Regions:
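Anion-binding and metal-coordination hotspots
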Residues: 1-207
Length: 207
């Protein structure tokens, strides 16, 4: 079970992710759509459980992989050559969508955009170098000759598409609920490794 970036999925899989069909609620497996998840009235007390719930979808996503082995390939002229053997990794992508997560991510982005607007007012090109995860990724220069930075609205709208989504890849046949429960507890496993690496001592070993 590994975390899978939705942004890095192939376009074919992305189309399935953003398609409304085949989503179900994680709590009871009832059918639900992304539109319903995005638009229900969260102030209605009857929707509290929905606000804390997730919509999920399971997508087959087999992929070719390098087996680390070699096989003999025979060409039409009779010549042979050893080439890397490819295998098929049978796996699934489990995608979830959360209204609560979507709103949280948009709140964070709004704060980043406010900081980006302040940075624009500095009008200092040397201070507007883009980073992959900082506020400067929302800025672009509209001139090739002079520094004329503006908000990159295309970049902002593209990033908004992924708000609320989370995905894991797995080759296990367990239920989506069980797999997601394990994935959500990954931080505990990572903490254990971190503690072991930090505080683990051993006596010298002589061979």
């Amino acid at each position: 079970i590994v975390t899978q970036s939705v942004k890095k999925l192939g376009q074919e899989i992305k189309d399935i992710v953003f398609n409304d069909s085949n989503y179900r609620l994680l709590s009871n497996d009832d059918a639900i759509t992304l539109k319903e998840m995005r638009t229900f009235d969260k102030k209605d007390a009857n929707n509290l459980s929905l606000y804390n719930d997730f919509a999920y979808k399971v997508i087959p996503a087999n992929t070719a992989m390098d087996t680390g082995l070699y096989e003999e390939k025979v060409y039409k002229n009779g010549r042979t050559k050893k080439v890397k053997a490819k295998g098929t990794l049978h796996q699934y992508i489990i995608v979830t969508f959360s209204r609560k997560m979507m709103e949280y991510q948009r709140t964070i982005r709004e704060r980043q955009l406010e900081r980006a607007k302040k940075l624009l007012r500095l009008k200092d090109p040397e201070k507007i170098k883009k980073g992959p995860n900082d506020i400067r990724r929302f800025l672009k220069n509209t001139s090739s000759d002079t520094a004329n930075y503006v908000l990159d609205m295309d970049k902002i709208h593209e990033e908004e598409k992924y708000d609320g989504f989370y995905a894991v890849a797995t080759n296990l046949d367990d239920s989506a609920k069980d797999i997601l429960a394990v994935a959500q507890n990954r931080y505990k496993i990572e903490d254990c490794f971190r503690i072991m690496k930090t505080n683990f001592d051993a006596r010298p070993v002589f061979l």
